[in-house]
């Protein structure tokens, strides 16, 4: 899901562990911002309600996460309700296989502008987020333990991004994130890590936005 953080990756695995008899691989994205953020503490924390409402996953006493109407911007929610009631326009933006349908490179945004804005949005004040970094390491270790106990393999990936995004990243934040996942992967035989951030096989036409 968009903006899904590591703690919800783990929560979904634990919730559906008995329904995944044929599962062999778990793919976990570890991107520039992943180790220093959680969904609850980010600018898109309104998405937490999706896990409470549609997955019945605990959101740690957040009463308001049980309501669509009280999350996000009220005018947007009213517009969504009107669109459905008047035009039967669904707000579901994925296909039956779970793949998102909202973003298509044919309708791409300005790669120069989105590279700058996204990199700024994803850059964290490191000194204020060491606790989150440590908690996310614990979460990854829990995911690895889950995979071990269910005889699963984990593939960690860093997704490709356009040059205008990469050029504006904090090198320390990026290095910390890449190094920790390399370290955790090297210590566990059921894991692999692939870094596609600078992969040159992806060209401008492949991107919807720079990140």
Feature locations, PLM:
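Active-site segments of SGNH/GDSL-like serine hydrolases
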Residues: 144-169
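Active-site-proximal beta-strand/loop segments in catalytic clefts of secreted hydrolases
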Residues: 2, 29-31, 157-160, 196-199
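Secreted/periplasmic serine-hydrolase-like ester/acetyl group-modifying domain
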Residues: 30, 39, 43-150
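Short catalytic/ligand-binding loop motif for oxyanion handling, primarily in non-cytosolic enzymes
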Residues: 34-38, 163-166, 203-204
């Amino acid at each position: 899901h968009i903006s899904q953080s590591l703690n919800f990756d783990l929560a979904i695995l634990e919730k559906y562990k008995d329904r995944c008899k044929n599962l062999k691989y778990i793919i976990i994205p570890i991107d520039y911002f992943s180790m220093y953020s959680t969904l609850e503490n980010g600018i898109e924390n309104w998405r937490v309600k999706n896990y409470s409402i549609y997955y019945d996953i605990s959101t740690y006493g957040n009463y308001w996460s049980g309501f669509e109407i009280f999350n996000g911007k009220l005018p947007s929610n009213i517009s969504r309700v009107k669109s459905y009631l008047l035009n039967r326009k669904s707000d579901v933006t994925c296909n039956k296989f779970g793949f998102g349908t909202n973003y298509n490179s044919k309708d791409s945004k300005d790669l120069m502008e989105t590279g700058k804005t996204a990199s700024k949005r994803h850059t964290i004040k490191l000194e204020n987020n060491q606790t989150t970094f440590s908690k996310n390491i614990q979460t990854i270790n829990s995911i690895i333990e889950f995979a071990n106990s269910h005889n699963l393999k984990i593939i960690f990936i860093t997704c490709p991004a356009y040059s205008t995004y990469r050029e504006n990243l904090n090198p320390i934040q990026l290095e910390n994130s890449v190094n920790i996942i390399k370290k955790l992967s090297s210590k566990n035989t059921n894991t692999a890590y692939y870094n596609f951030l600078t992969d040159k096989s992806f060209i401008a036409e492949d991107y919807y936005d720079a990140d």
